[in-house]
Every structure is written in C-alpha cells, then in structure tokens.
C-alpha cells in the first residue's frame, strides 16, 4: 500500500528510517533537516588531500582540516572538531534556549549537521548484550535481524575474539588495521594471563569500528576527521537516500512543532533563510532529531505535556593508564597508526554481562600533549614527557544508565511559537558506586595486563557529555498502562497514532556499550514493522496546528 512519510533529521536514526521507508518504491519520503555542512573552504582543503599520496599533501590544506579546538578553560574533554570545524555543534536554533545551572553540564546536545553527531563520533559499533533486552519489551531475538540489517549499511571492522561471546559479530566484516604497539602488548598479555583476567570479571578484545578498514592508510588523522572519509557517517546513508526518485530532501528547516490533524501527521517548521513558517503533512511522521531534540519537540507540541521528564544516560568517565614497559615514541618519524579506539576492556559484575562497565582504550594522538600536566609541557621536561607518552593509554569508560545519575529535563514555554526552553540538571552529583568498583577491578588486573589505571586522575564527565543518553519516552511493555511519557513498541505516544519517535528517546535502558548501532537497529525495526502494517491503531487527533503554508 502506498504511503507518504515525513522524517525529521538526518542523523543515525533518521537516516536508517529514511532508507528503510524509501527502499519501497510505493512510499514517498520527505526529509526535513537543518542540514548544516562543513564550510566551503574546509571542504575544498579536504578535497585537496583526498585520494592523494600523503607525501604530496599541501601543509596549508592539512592545517585547515586538522585544527584543534580552542581551550575552554574548564577541566574535561574538549568539544571535538571534524576537519577543523565545529559545524556539528553550531547553533542554528536547535540549542537556543537550552541551559543549566550546573557547571560542567553539556549543552551541545542537539546537532544541526547533515548526518548529525555521526560526523564526530568514535565509530564504535557494538550491539547491546542479550541480557540488556531482558528489561525491554523487545527481545534480543527480535532485534537481531535489525542489527544485521543495520550492519548491511554500516561497514564493520572487527575481529572474532572473547568479546564475541557477549557481543556477536552478526555480519560480514573486514579486519582492523594493524594495531599500535601498546594495544598489541596488552592483547598479548591478556592471552597469556587470560584465565586470571577473566576470573576478575574482565574481558579484553579488539575494537569494533564502523570503518572501511581495507582502505585505511594509517595516516593518524582519525580523531580530527578521516581525509579519505572512511569512518561511517549517517551523511553517507542520506546521500544514498537522496538519490532515490521517491525522496524529497528539504534543508535549512527547523522543526518547531509536531502533531496530527485528522488522519494526517504534521510537522511545522521555520525556514532559516526567510524566517517564514511552513507546515508539512503526510500519512506518518518519524521523528529522529536526537534524544534531546525529539524530547524538546514533544514537550513543545503535546496538548498536556509534563513539566519535566527524566533522561537516562550511560555516564562517561576518563581514566588514564600507564604501563611499566615502554613502547617506541609514538611521535617518532615514520610512525603510522590509526587513532580510533583500538581495544576494549569489559568489566562485568554478573554472569549475564548486563551490569558492566565498558572502557574504550585509545592510542596516542596529538591532543595528549595538551592534556599533560603543565610541568611536563615545559621544554625542559621533554625527556620526561616522552617517557610518559611511551607508556600512556587513555580510556573512555561508560557505565550503564541504571548505574548512572539521571538528567532532569524541565520545559518552559518558548517565544513566538518557537521551541520550548529547556533546563538540564543532574541532581545526583555523587560519584556512581559502579565507577569505584570498576576502578578496583582494573587495578587488580593491572599486573597481568601491564595497564595501570591512575585513580587519582580519573575524570567523571559532566552530565550529557557521553552523548549516550535518551529514554525520556521509553517503549513500554505490551499491556502496561499508557501514560504521557512512554511509547508503544513503534514509538507512539498515546495522543498521536501517526507520529513515531525513532531515536534514543525511546530506548528503555542504555547499556555501557556504545549505543549508536542499537539506535539505528531499533529505528530500522520501527520503520520495518510500520511498513508491514503494524502500529495502525485508530487515529486520535489531539494537536491542531495552524496552517501557514501547506506542502
């Protein structure tokens, strides 16, 4: 049966929904997007580098696309850049009106970029464990096929190792690029002391990356933006979607209201170029504006919104490791390495690998120099700094949402019919108990792995900094009472039968493993089931939007 659909956004979930819907020629898809892009001059510089031998790279062009972010004067992980640009975070209206009274709270939580935050992600692509879905209304057996379908779209570089027992590989893959000497040393020691380390509840394995690894040149620029564009971005999927004849893409639009009129779903937008407002209608609306962006739309559009909602987060922490045995200086002439996460340490507190902390371990990249203590950055301390860099590994760790502080989102009416203002706060400021338990396990395993955590230098990132957040409108179990802050398995709130939330906002829980692959798989599941005729209950229009311009 033919149908028309609106898709809000172009990030991971929106791209997967648009691809799924548009794969049916009888379905017409209109994508409404802010569509922020890399600046023209940086795009030109990138094109000068792409496909050329690195020895012939223009230093000026290289400098333009590898510029580091300016220090903000605060302790913590700096805002990431891609090709020297902050365009994924640039405010085109999507973060205006977001605030927090708590220092350190991340407010760069909605992307304006074409492709969303996949332009700056770490490319880790792992499913949630089977046991995570015991707390969901959707079982692992249902999700597995959608993980596989997602990995048909996302290139995976991975190895079959001990992590596969909990996180199956699920699909074809390429091998990772050669690992750096520190990663190889840790993995060799893990193999030699495997029984001892596993007895402590730790599993060590290679990274799982959304990367076309077979073309990787190991130029070392992963963290500033791959010059060959080998790291997956949802923009790549959207590029493919936009070439289909049954897809219309509209950018420079800020969606401000969503709802239903009669048997049609409605999205009301503001044109960024003209300031004029327009209304789009279709049979169904799929909202993939990111967890906070979608939450904001719902709170501003619902007939009787709650004054506040709770958002789950897989809280991030940063842990530096030192090793007794040094490797070669990572800055030595001719050194080649890829700088994405190279190996993972899973710390498990149960037999089912549900209560876990997941640590992604990164090799050297130039940002480490600026993060060294001030005395080590002095020229007179260059030998000491070199000694540290030959031993240093940085881990980005995550806790599951049920062991992490929650974020309270409070809404206030916006101005002139625009988006509501939001206040983000994390009332619980205590260090999560699981973090301490994780560090103790890592210390106990350190002699076997020669990977010694520095507990005194562990940083618990501010609320929202992990970017693994959502669950404001979680899927509820079948038969559970419907309320204004839960959705059915197709992402529908009780008042809208034709509006589907499809991003992280509907995840019931967030495991400690990275969640982008799960967000994409769940979005694919929703779109696939809707196309198959599910989620077609009686229409109950609630929100009537004034038509200023119909499309």
Positions of PLM-derived features:
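A glycine-rich dinucleotide-binding beta-alpha-beta segment and adjacent secondary-structure elements
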Residues: 90-95, 210, 215-222, 256-259, ...
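Mid-to-C-terminal "cap/lid" subdomains and adjacent gly/pro-rich loops that border
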Residues: 36, 45-87, 248, 256, ...
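Conserved redox-cofactor binding core of oxidoreductases
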Residues: 57, 61-90, 100-103, 107, ...
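Conserved beta-strand-loop-beta-strand element in the redox core of flavoprotein oxidoreductases
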Residues: 257-279
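N-terminal glycine-rich phosphate/pyrophosphate-binding loop and immediately adjacent elements
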Residues: 3-141, 305-338, 521, 525, ...
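Core beta-strand elements of the Rossmann-like FAD/NAD(P) dinucleotide-binding domain
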Residues: 2-3, 275-284, 288
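C-terminal catalytic lobe of FAD-dependent flavoproteins
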Residues: 373-448, 452
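A conserved FAD-binding loop/helix module that cradles the flavin
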Residues: 509-527
